[in-house]
Amino acid sequence: MSETKPKRDSEYEGSNIKRMRLDDDDDVLRSPTRTLSSSSSSSLAYSVSDSGGFCSVALSEEEDDHLSSSISSGCSSSETNEIATRLPFSDLEAHEISETEISTLLTNNFRKQGISSSENLGETAEMDSATTEMRDQRKTEKKKKMEKSPTQAELDDFFSAAERYEQKRFTEKYNYDIVNDTPLEGRYQWVSLKP
C-alpha cells in the first residue's frame, strides 16, 4: 500500500482508499513522494516523504461534520508550510481544513524548533538593565521637579491675581458684582426673584 502508481488516481482493491501522486514543480526538494489517503470513514491522511525525513498530517472528521483538531507533524517549517498550502481534498464540502488547524500545526512546529535558553537570558538581562535605567532616570527627574515646586505664598499670589482678573472681566461683561452679590448699572438690568 506504500507504493505509488504512476497513474493520477488509483483505486485499491477491496477498499475505498484512494492514493494520488502529486506533481511537484520544485526540483530543489529532490522530488518527494506525496500521497493522499481517504476512506469512507471520513478520515484524511496526508504524508510527504523523501530520503531526508518523513512528514505527515492526519485529520479526522467526526460524525457531526466538525473536524477534530488532531494534527501530528514531524516537518520542518518549509515542509509544514508546503503541506498547509498544497493539501488536496477529493471532496471539498466533506473535508475542509480550518485556518485554526493550520496555525496550530505551524505553531507546534515552531515550538519544537525553539530558541536556546542562553539567547533568551541575554536578551532579558539587556532589557532589564534598560528598564532599570529608565526607571532611575524618571525618579531623578521627578525629584528635580519636586525641588523646583513653588511655595505656598507663590501659589496664593498666582491664584489671587487670576481671581481678580476673572472678577473684573465678569463685572465688565454682565454689570454684576459677584463678590458683594449686587447688580451694577450697565447694559443688563437685574431683577431679583423671590421664591
Swiss-Prot record:
Entry keywords, A to Z: Cell cycle, Nucleus, Phosphoprotein, Protein kinase inhibitor, Ubl conjugation
GO biological process: negative regulation of cyclin-dependent protein serine/threonine kinase activity
Record-listed Phosphothreonine modification sites: 151
Keyword Metal-binding: no
Tissue specificity as recorded in UniProt: Expressed in flowers, in developing pollen, and at lower levels in roots and leaves.
Subcellular location: Nucleus, Nucleoplasm
Keyword set includes Phosphoprotein: yes
Processing after translation: Ubiquitinated by SCF(FBL17). Ubiquitination leads to its subsequent degradation, thus controlling cell cycle progression.
Basic and acidic residues compositional bias, start-end: 1-11
Region (Disordered): 1-50, 61-80, 117-154
GO cellular component: a single term: male germ cell nucleus
Pfam families assigned: CDI (PF02234)
InterPro entries the UniProt entry points to: CDI_dom (IPR003175), CDI_dom_sf (IPR044898), KRP (IPR044275)
GO MF terms held by the record: cyclin-dependent protein serine/threonine kinase inhibitor activity
Ranges annotated as biased composition (Low complexity): 37-50, 68-80
Quaternary organization: Specifically interacts with CDKA-1, but not with CDKB1-1. Interacts with CYCD4-1. Binds to FBL17.
Task performed by this protein: Binds and inhibits CYCD2-1/CDKA-1 complex kinase activity. May target specifically CDKA-1.
Family: Belongs to the CDI family. ICK/KRP subfamily.
PANTHER family: CYCLIN-DEPENDENT KINASE INHIBITOR 4-RELATED
Protein name: Cyclin-dependent kinase inhibitor 7
